[in-house]
Amino acid sequence: MHTAIQELEKAQLRSDVPDFRPGDTLNVHVRVTEGNRTRIQVFKGVVIRRQGSGIRETFTVRKISYAVGVERTFPVHSPVIEKIEVVSRGRVRRAKLYYLRNLRGKAARIRERR
Protein backbone atom coordinates (compact mmCIF):
# COMPACT_ATOMS: atom_id res chain seq x y z
CA MET A 1 0.00 0.00 0.00
CA HIS A 2 2.79 2.39 0.88
CA THR A 3 4.44 2.13 -2.54
CA ALA A 4 1.08 2.57 -4.27
CA ILE A 5 0.64 5.92 -2.51
CA GLN A 6 4.17 6.95 -3.47
CA GLU A 7 3.48 6.09 -7.12
CA LEU A 8 0.30 8.19 -7.10
CA GLU A 9 2.13 11.12 -5.52
CA LYS A 10 5.00 10.84 -8.00
CA ALA A 11 2.52 11.16 -10.87
CA GLN A 12 1.19 14.43 -9.38
CA LEU A 13 4.60 16.14 -9.04
CA ARG A 14 5.29 19.04 -11.38
CA SER A 15 8.45 19.04 -13.45
CA ASP A 16 8.43 22.76 -14.36
CA VAL A 17 9.27 24.06 -10.86
CA PRO A 18 12.48 26.14 -10.94
CA ASP A 19 15.20 25.81 -8.33
CA PHE A 20 14.64 28.46 -5.64
CA ARG A 21 15.60 28.94 -2.01
CA PRO A 22 14.64 31.24 0.87
CA GLY A 23 15.84 34.76 0.10
CA ASP A 24 15.01 34.53 -3.60
CA THR A 25 12.49 36.95 -5.12
CA LEU A 26 9.78 35.19 -7.11
CA ASN A 27 6.91 36.02 -9.43
CA VAL A 28 4.21 33.43 -8.71
CA HIS A 29 1.53 33.39 -11.42
CA VAL A 30 -1.65 32.16 -9.71
CA ARG A 31 -4.91 31.24 -11.45
CA VAL A 32 -7.73 33.13 -9.66
CA THR A 33 -11.39 32.22 -10.23
CA GLU A 34 -13.93 34.99 -9.68
CA GLY A 35 -17.46 33.85 -10.44
CA ASN A 36 -17.26 32.17 -13.84
CA ARG A 37 -14.12 34.04 -14.95
CA THR A 38 -10.56 32.94 -14.38
CA ARG A 39 -7.53 35.18 -14.64
CA ILE A 40 -3.85 35.09 -13.80
CA GLN A 41 -2.69 37.12 -10.80
CA VAL A 42 1.02 37.69 -10.18
CA PHE A 43 2.23 37.59 -6.57
CA LYS A 44 5.77 39.00 -6.35
CA GLY A 45 7.76 38.72 -3.15
CA VAL A 46 10.60 37.17 -1.18
CA VAL A 47 10.57 33.49 -0.24
CA ILE A 48 10.76 33.38 3.56
CA ARG A 49 10.24 29.65 4.01
CA ARG A 50 10.24 26.37 2.13
CA GLN A 51 9.14 23.27 3.99
CA GLY A 52 7.92 19.72 3.47
CA SER A 53 8.85 17.30 0.74
CA GLY A 54 7.23 15.56 -2.18
CA ILE A 55 3.63 16.45 -2.93
CA ARG A 56 3.26 18.18 0.48
CA GLU A 57 6.03 20.73 -0.11
CA THR A 58 5.03 24.36 0.42
CA PHE A 59 6.70 27.75 0.25
CA THR A 60 5.75 31.11 1.73
CA VAL A 61 6.22 34.38 -0.16
CA ARG A 62 6.17 37.77 1.59
CA LYS A 63 5.58 41.14 -0.05
CA ILE A 64 4.69 44.64 1.10
CA SER A 65 1.41 45.89 -0.39
CA TYR A 66 0.32 49.46 0.45
CA ALA A 67 2.58 49.51 3.54
CA VAL A 68 1.09 46.25 4.84
CA GLY A 69 3.06 43.01 4.88
CA VAL A 70 1.29 40.20 3.03
CA GLU A 71 2.38 36.57 3.24
CA ARG A 72 0.96 33.81 1.11
CA THR A 73 1.74 30.10 1.34
CA PHE A 74 1.59 28.03 -1.83
CA PRO A 75 1.90 24.28 -2.38
CA VAL A 76 4.85 23.85 -4.77
CA HIS A 77 3.05 21.29 -6.93
CA SER A 78 -0.38 22.99 -6.94
CA PRO A 79 -2.29 23.05 -10.25
CA VAL A 80 -3.50 26.57 -9.33
CA ILE A 81 0.03 27.91 -9.93
CA GLU A 82 0.54 28.66 -13.63
CA LYS A 83 4.28 29.26 -13.34
CA ILE A 84 7.00 30.37 -10.97
CA GLU A 85 9.65 32.84 -12.14
CA VAL A 86 12.82 33.57 -10.20
CA VAL A 87 13.39 37.35 -10.43
CA SER A 88 16.56 37.50 -8.34
CA ARG A 89 18.56 35.22 -6.07
CA GLY A 90 19.16 36.39 -2.52
CA ARG A 91 22.08 35.65 -0.21
CA VAL A 92 20.87 34.70 3.27
CA ARG A 93 22.26 32.60 6.11
CA ARG A 94 19.00 31.17 7.42
CA ALA A 95 16.48 28.66 6.11
CA LYS A 96 13.51 30.48 7.66
CA LEU A 97 13.48 34.25 7.26
CA TYR A 98 10.84 35.09 9.88
CA TYR A 99 13.00 37.97 11.12
CA LEU A 100 11.99 39.94 8.00
CA ARG A 101 8.55 40.42 9.56
CA ASN A 102 10.05 42.83 12.10
CA LEU A 103 12.17 44.83 9.63
CA ARG A 104 11.02 47.85 7.63
CA GLY A 105 12.33 49.60 4.53
CA LYS A 106 16.01 49.33 3.71
CA ALA A 107 16.69 47.07 6.70
CA ALA A 108 14.57 44.38 5.04
CA ARG A 109 16.73 44.29 1.90
CA ILE A 110 18.43 41.03 0.96
CA ARG A 111 21.84 40.93 -0.70
CA GLU A 112 22.11 39.54 -4.21
CA ARG A 113 23.69 36.12 -4.64
CA ARG A 114 26.36 35.87 -7.32
UniProtKB/Swiss-Prot annotation:
Q: Is Acetylation found in the keyword set?
A: no
Gene3D superfamilies, sorted: 2.30.30.790
User: What keywords are annotated for this sequence in UniProt?
Assistant: Ribonucleoprotein, Ribosomal protein
Entries under Pfam families matching the protein:
Ribosomal_L19
Give start-end ranges for the coiled-coil region(s): none
Q: Which GO terms describe its molecular function?
A: structural constituent of ribosome
**Its GO CC terms?**
cytosolic large ribosomal subunit
Question: Which family does the record claim for this protein?
Answer: Belongs to the bacterial ribosomal protein bL19 family.
The UniProt entry, under HAMAP family, shows: Ribosomal_bL19
Q: What does this protein do?
A: This protein is located at the 30S-50S ribosomal subunit interface and may play a role in the structure and function of the aminoacyl-tRNA binding site.
Name of the protein: Large ribosomal subunit protein bL19
Q: Which gene encodes it?
A: rplS
